[in-house]
Amino acid sequence: VKSTNLMAFVATKMLERQEDLDTCTEMQVEKMKTSTKARLRTESSFAPRTWEDAIKDGELLFNGTILQAESPTMTPASVEMKGKKFPIDFAPSNIAPIGQNPIYLSPCIPNFDGNVWEATMYHHRGATLTKTMNCNCFQRTIWCHPNPSRMRLSYAFVLYCRNTKKICGYLIARQVAGIETGIRKCFRCIKSGFVMATDEISLTILQSIKSGAQLDPYWGNETPDIDKTEAYMLSLREAGP
């Protein structure tokens, strides 16, 4: 039921941004919407709800509303995998950010050298999380980039750090048949706005991200309060290490 609601929400929001989708992607999303409606009818015997109810519940599960936003400004980047550097094309704002979570007030140290992001990769259930910054401030802003062909990926969620205005990670589903399969694989890793993992290394690093977010005193705000943020950072500096 939860998976169906999530798919209903994403399909609806993606189709609201048709001008940002190519014809092939739009057809795949329409197909996803049709199959999700079929699942909803099948589930109606034990979980009766309307299509609109499914969308609303999916929005809550996804930890916020998809909003309009500008793409972060950055130079073309590449990521090194197995000794080779692959270029990455970040789409402008195919799908706007997920959630309205405020910033996480911790220092962000980009692991950035020129146009090369030295990335740490974590594998989980057919998807790969690549962490590109030495910080725990995963703002739940995710850029949806269908079919980045040069890396031969079918789907990518790009995580964006509001503290440094830079990409801090991205989650990809590799070697999948279509956009719906890619989204489903990523959903296995994303629950209510948080990335989940089962292997020990991924679990440790991602639990620290989640716990850090829960400790953020401004987590409940819809938008960051700049004055409070500056005051909080000043108090941390005055307190010392």
Curated annotation (Swiss-Prot):
Superkingdom of the source species: Viruses
Main location: host cell
Any one GO cellular component localisation term in the record: host cell cytoplasm
InterPro entries: Flu_C_NS1, Flu_C_NS2
Function summary: Suppresses the RNA silencing-based antiviral response in Drosophila cells.
Protein name from the UniProt record: Non-structural protein 1
A Pfam family recorded for this sequence: Flu_C_NS2
